[in-house]
A protein has these predicted regions:
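C-terminal motif of bacterial Sec signal peptides marking the signal peptidase cleavage site
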Residues: 16-18
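N-terminal acidic, glycine/proline-rich low-complexity segments
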Residues: 20-176
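Bacterial N-terminal signal peptides that target proteins for export
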Residues: 1-8
């Protein structure tokens, strides 16, 4: 009975790792693929992480061009967790925009991003690599990142995928 449980656990770990493994090759982005900006309330659950995982898989296949990720939750853990994911999937160059005065998830009863960011190895080092160095509060404001990314693209050529709130989108529409 014990061996069969260990075997099943091993199979489960193998199955899960194959779903979230790093990309095996660098994808070539073709000019006709959709250009995407992800708007996310990443932090208190895993739906956003799964959506981001799917976008990385589309990037790997060359099916999209992910221009940036904007976060609409207050605090450093959502941005740090997004940096961990960008690094894990080998896309550290994807810019991250943050929001101030957004929804506060730092003290949520369930804060998935915080839990992952605080995992440490036995030697006290973070368990997951990050690409960005320094204070995550110094990342560009999401509306400013939107304006920058959208200004670099032809009109009507970018799709914004929103998972959660749309806090950073609103100021972009009212700003010059």
């Amino acid at each position: 009975m014990r061996k069969s449980k260990l075997y099943l656990i091993g199979l489960l770990v193998l199955a899960l790792s194959s779903c979230t493994s790093k990309k095996q090759q660098t994808a070539e982005i073709t000019p006709n693929v959709p250009k995407i900006i992800l708007e996310t309330d990443i932090g208190n659950d895993v739906d956003d992480a799964l959506a981001l995982d799917m976008l990385y898989k589309y990037l790997d296949a060359g099916d999209i061009d992910l221009l940036g990720i904007t976060i609409n939750k207050e605090g450093t853990y959502p941005a740090e967790y997004t940096d961990i994911m960008n690094t894990w999937y080998d896309y550290p160059q994807i810019p991250i925009g943050i929001i101030h005065n957004g929804a506060d998830c730092e003290n949520d009863a369930t804060n998935y991003a915080k839990a992952v960011c605080l995992i440490q190895k036995d030697n006290g080092e973070p368990a997951f690599k990050r690409s960005l160095k320094g204070d995550y509060n110094q990342l560009p404001e999401a509306p400013a990142l939107y304006r920058k990314l959208l200004a670099q693209q032809p009109d009507s050529s970018v799709t914004i995928i929103s998972v959660g709130f749309s806090t950073p989108c609103t100021p972009v529409g009212y700003s010059g």
